[in-house]
Structures are given as C-alpha cells and as structure tokens.
A protein has these predicted regions:
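Hydrophobic transmembrane alpha-helices
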Residues: 1-38
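Hydrophobic alpha-helical transmembrane segments
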Residues: 6-11, 34-35, 46-53, 70-74, ...
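Small-residue faces within membrane-embedded alpha-helices
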Residues: 9-13, 17, 48, 52, ...
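Interfacial aromatic-anchored transmembrane helix boundaries in multi-pass membrane proteins
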Residues: 17-31, 53-87
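Generic transmembrane alpha-helix motif of multi-pass integral membrane proteins
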Residues: 32-48, 82-86
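Membrane-embedded alpha-helical hairpins and interfacial helices in multi-pass inner-membrane proteins
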Residues: 69-70, 91-175
C-alpha cells in the first residue's frame, strides 16, 4: 500500500486498540471487531485484513501476548477480509445499517468465536476429540453472544460516521 493508505490503516489500528482498552473493565464487550468490520467496508478487504491482524497483535501488548495471539490475529483479519469482500463495493449507509449490524453479530459469534473456541481446544488439550470441541463451543457461546451484541451496538453507533469519514479520506488522498 501507498504511504497515504498506511497512515489511514495505522490510525484505524490505533482506534481499534484504544477502543478495546477503554472497555477493558467490561468482559467480552469490546468495539474492536466493529472497527475492523468498518475498516474492511470502508477501505476494502486488504485493509480490513491488515487492520484486523494488526489490531489484535498491538492490543495484546496491553492485554498480554500468548499462544492465542496468532489465533486472534487470524480471526480478526478474516472478519476484516470478509467484510471488505462482501460490503466494500455496494455499501449504502441508509440501506445497509441493519444488515451490517446483523453481519457483525454473526461474525462475532460464528467466525471470531468459532475460530477462538477451536483455538482453545487445540492450544490446551493433548487429546483432541469431538467432545472437547462441543464443550468449547457450548461454553463459549454466551461469551460470543455478548461479543456479538457489543458488535451490533458499536456498529449501529459508529458505522455511518466512520465510513463517511473514510470515504472523504479516500477521495481527498486518492486512496
């Protein structure tokens, strides 16, 4: 990417990391996934992936690096990538607000939650079997739903304004 685009990506990563940090006291209620989705929608799949992976990596300097970090990077990056592939060309703020919020909930529960629940089994068990995966998915479901609800709320609050600003930046700096 061009230097102009890298600056915008760095700003979005910073927003995502700060947003996770600000809500540290509320378990699983984080706006970071919403920022990643908005990045993918506003700047395309490549930037969505980069913002997702870099945000997970950088925020873990505050919350702690561990064997889960690459899994978080992969999960967040995947959400940003898919968001860009699905919405970046056909996004209309007036018509797409609710579908993007529903999509954000599904991303938190199915994609991010599914990858992280799978990661917990693979990281912490020597005897991998379907029972462990089932237990991980069932026990992780309430956590994923809370994360999904927070993603809906933050997408509802932020998507229109942030995407409008990203579109303005894209035009102004020919990104």
């Amino acid at each position: 990417p061009q230097a102009r685009k890298l600056v915008v990506i760095a700003a979005l990563v910073t927003i995502a990391v700060i947003s996770r940090t600000v809500f540290y006291m509320i378990p699983f209620f984080k706006p970071m996934l919403a920022v990643v989705i908005i990045s993918g929608i506003g700047l395309g799949w490549e930037c969505g992936f980069i913002v997702g992976t870099a945000s997970a990596f950088m925020s873990n300097f505050i919350f702690g690096q561990g064997p889960w970090t690459p899994w978080q990077m992969f999960a967040m990056g995947t959400v940003g990538l898919i968001s860009g592939l699905i919405f970046s060309k056909k996004y209309n703020a007036d018509k797409m607000k609710i579908p993007v919020c529903i999509y954000g909930f599904l991303c938190a529960v199915v994609i991010y939650g599914g990858i992280m629940d799978t990661a917990s089994v693979l990281m912490y068990s020597n005897d991998v079997n379907t029972g462990l995966f089932t237990a991980a998915y069932i026990s992780g479901f309430p956590v994923n739903v809370i994360h999904g609800i927070s993603t809906i709320i933050f997408l509802a609050l932020m998507q229109k304004g942030m995407i409008k600003k990203l579109n303005r930046v894209k035009i102004k700096y020919s990104i």
